[in-house]
Amino acid sequence: MNPTPVIEVENLTKRYPGRTAISGLSFTVGQGEIVGLLGPNGAGKSTTMRILACYLPASSGTARVAGHDVFTESEEVRRRIGYLPESNPLHLDMRVREYLKFRARLKGLSIGRSRDRVDRVLEQCGLADVSRKVIGQLSKGFRQRVGLADALVHEPDLIILDEPTIGLDPHQIRSVRQLIKDLGKLHTILISTHILPEVEMTCSRVLILHEGRIVAADTPANLQHSISTGDQVIAEIAAPLEQLRHAWEHAPEVEHFDIAPCDGDYFRCALTPRPGVDLRPQVFSLAKENNWRLRELTHGRHSLEEIFVHLTRKDREETL
């Protein structure tokens, strides 16, 4: 028998006067998954998370966390989630340990249990060395860790993270990403972001939102094969640009191509074939016939950025 999903969402809709923020969302998240909500600003990511965190009522549909309805059992749901909103509100005049003890008591933990859990999350989130410091004196990266520790302190079934690396420098981003991956070994995590590498490096599954609707849901690896059943070929060739364009435009097996300059006289040609076609022999033959200098010929794969652009463009075309 399969365990109950940690998140169950069915036909979830949120309307505001004059606009619909999310429309008919349905998805599940299983135990131990790190699932990314990916989409541009305004796609409905934060709205979805606020509904799951009981911060915002839906207009229609159902949502359950660990088997409990977020609308009729909101108190029980709040006990089972740890939520880090995008704004990460903290008491900046409190010390780290003091703040986490305060938050643990607010979440219903006993004095003894609070002490044990605060010690645990300080270690887990790399905060032990700054536990006596005032939060307002910490860097943005450490403040984000305090927010994560707060979300973890009551041992929730689900951790909800809304844009957890926004505003951080590259070093802080890497540090927080690694922390999230480590937490994913023990917790179910739902993370929202508009940063494509964030999902690729952190998440086991992706939900792509566009204009309040889910347009794709799969693993990053499967999504990278979703645009075409053919395998993209990357060729770096030194040749006149017009010759390359003419060759790919008149090659019947090439469904789509992009040409970008590389170093020197070389161009990077990204060639998407028709389904089931391997373009490499044809590219090699063309290079030989035209005396092009070919220095690289490999299978490529679509980036999440290409997938996102493709899916949202396709979605817009279907609604016209």
Residues of each region from the PLM?
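C-terminal coupling/interaction segments
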Residues: 3, 274-320
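ABC transporter nucleotide-binding domains
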Residues: 4-9, 14-211, 215-216
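A generic structural signal for secondary-structure junctions
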Residues: 82, 108, 126, 147, ...
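Positions that flank functional sites
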Residues: 119, 137, 263-264, 302
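ABC transporter nucleotide-binding domain
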Residues: 177-274
